[in-house]
Amino acid sequence: MSAKIIAFPRPRQPPAAPAPTLWSVFEERAARNPRKRAVRDADGSMTYAELLNLSAQLGRAFLREAERQPRRRRIGMLGQNSAVHLATLLGCARAGLAMVPINWRLAEEEWCWQARDAAMCAVVEGFGHRMPEDFMAADEISAIGQSTIRMLPREPVTEAERGSPGDTVVIGYTSGTTGRPKGACLSQAAMLANARHSQALFEITADDRVLTMLPMFHLGGLNIQTVPALLAGAEIILHQKFDAEAFFDALTRHRPTLTLLVPAVMQALVEHRRWATADLSSLRAAGAGSSVVPLALIEAFQSRGVPIQQVYGSTETAPIAIAQSREEAWAAPGSIGRPVGDCEARLGPGGEIQLRGPSIMTGYLDDPAATAESLVEGWYRTGDIGSVDAEGRWWFTDRLKHMIISGGENISPAEVERVLAQAPGVLECAVIGRPDTKWGEVPLAVVVAGPGFDERKVLAFFEGRLARFKQPRAVAVVPALPRTALGKVNLPALRAMVAAPP
């Protein structure tokens, strides 16, 4: 008698939950407490439900623009900090499109170049900044201004979300050492990974009030604290731009628990007449970064009970990669901390800091050569030199790349040199950073003068061609530029030459 085999059906496995998107995380957060205030800005305040609806309406409007021009699926954002900036990001996430923040400090010519390079189909404009109308008309790019936004429908959007975790949701332009800025492509998954890192680092909860004064056209202002706090259900206090008086007023009026600073802002606050009597007790901590933070500034804040948590990263890392916990801010001021969350860090040749993890960019927009140079087997080459101490803390020591950092803004010398070379009376030129007590560094033009050279005319030549913060403050004339055996400008020798007394 043969045995009878009875086959039992396998129990059905529940379907795996879909991977979260930027929109799904925000939508879930808004559903928990729809009436809670999400954002304060110059126009008033907005609840989570109101921000959710505005974001969805903008997302639908963006899709219409993208369908009108299928080859252009990017949305520019030009304007000072506002709730609309956050709604633009969230609307793009819902629609499966990418937001491109535009630095309003740049010259109009630079705005237009970026709009073309990113293939924008529309630009959201606000708070006194507008793209040139003739350019927008010629390139068939739609302008979405405040009046258009006010006229958006108020009923809920019923269309399904189109975004997915792998979609590029932000293209952040970053100054490169070779001249033109490059667009770093960040996916929704990268933005969410950064949010997790930030929430753990700063211990962000729904009870927090985060003061954002730094511009959100930079990934630092947008994504070190602001978006992570929004996804945690906190309240965001947006200032259009940094103003020391407004900062001290906000301490009294809104009692923020967290904020983000750069050295130039810290210096301005410490030197302000209200610093000595200001009540900083509501601040649990402040993040700081963008360039080396002087120990004297760290001490000025920490002596008032506010730990300065240094953050290291770049646009390409969304941006947090290495950072200090609150405990380490007290224990090792000046260190940049340890790799955050799922991020890995190592020292490459020459002590270069190299990073790998879920928040790293997918690459540079339409630039495979630059991508291949910066991303090697998944490791992002930062171009910065660092070290690791016996306790495992990381320290920033120098830059491999020739970059000027002025008031928290990255300035590519090659970009400035391209304009300088066209100025009348300039035979040869180079641009280097000169130490400055207020800004950290400012650009200095070094030229070999020819017929018709006039320093005032050279400095005036930059007006309208480059943003004010990129323009050299002075010109140093040298008989010849020192060069290496390969013919490249010898930067250490050039710095020594212009620093030496005449």
Predicted regions and their residues:
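ANL superfamily AMP-binding
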Residues: 35-36, 49-76, 106-108, 112, ...
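AMP-dependent adenylate-forming
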Residues: 24-47, 65
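Gly/Ser/Thr-rich phosphate-binding loop
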Residues: 256-261, 270-330, 344
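Conserved pre-ATP/AMP-binding loop-to-beta segment of ANL
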Residues: 19-22, 34, 143, 154-173, ...
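Conserved AMP-binding/adenylation subdomain of ANL enzymes
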Residues: 192-209, 217-258, 271-274
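Conserved AMP-binding/adenylate-forming
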Residues: 44-45, 61-109, 410
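Structural core segment of the AMP-binding/adenylate-forming
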Residues: 64-65, 90, 94-154, 158-161, ...
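AMP-binding/adenylate-forming catalytic core of the ANL superfamily
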Residues: 60, 85, 347-349, 357, ...
